[in-house]
Amino acid sequence: RDLYNVNMDNAAVGVVIDQSGDDIRHFNRLGYSREKGYFNSGLLLMDLEVWREKELPNKVLEYIDSHKGNLQFHDQDALNAVLYDDTYYLPMKYNSQFSFLYKNPYIDKSRWQDMYEAAEHPVIIHYTNKIKPWHRECIHPYKDIWFEYYKKTEWGKNKLREYSKKGYMKILIKEFLNKCGIRKLNPPTMLREEFYKFYQH
């Protein structure tokens, strides 16, 4: 309810920064200023009157059509390219992404406090990592919340899928080499200490 009562100051859409939202490569690719930000399209709080008035759906589709083959993140790139100057940034807890759990994600330090609060007290959880809660190998700290609702559906008794063995083995090997001190993981892939307790099985 709080989300729907947000005053967006006549912006077309309320958004949350992407988990790599301050990565300069986004702005080099899309051709606008880093100061405008790069948002995640998993949650969009739309002012439909503004969208209709400015014909934004058509503009997004036109952008997609004219940039075929150049959209690394598909609809998300197109939405950012069209709407970067017509957004209202919401607290990050409304789209809490997996990389918010990391020590050093591609997010400016000025946003870290908001990011930490979103990780520890999320309102909407966005399972953005490759291994999802419906994969047996999932070790997301909040996977149990997903299961709570999954069990209430008609699919709740289905067996979980197995993630790609090749992809999962790569993850395990990287973690093993990191623990042995042979090859350190890049900082953006290292979880903050308070979340390691979820990984001790």
Give the residues covered by each predicted segment.
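A glycosyltransferase accessory/donor-loop signature
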Residues: 41, 50-201
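Serine-hydrolase catalytic core recognition
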Residues: 47
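N-terminal short leaders/motifs
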Residues: 1, 33-35, 74-78
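Short, P/G- and charge-enriched loop/turn segments at secondary-structure junctions
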Residues: 28-34, 109-114
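Conserved donor-nucleotide/metal-binding helix-loop-beta segment in metal-dependent transferases, i.e.
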Residues: 1-30
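A recurrent flexible, glycine/aromatic-enriched loop bordering the glycosyltransferase active site
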Residues: 32-43
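Short, conserved loop/helix-junction motifs that constitute active-site signature segments
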Residues: 5-8, 36-37, 55
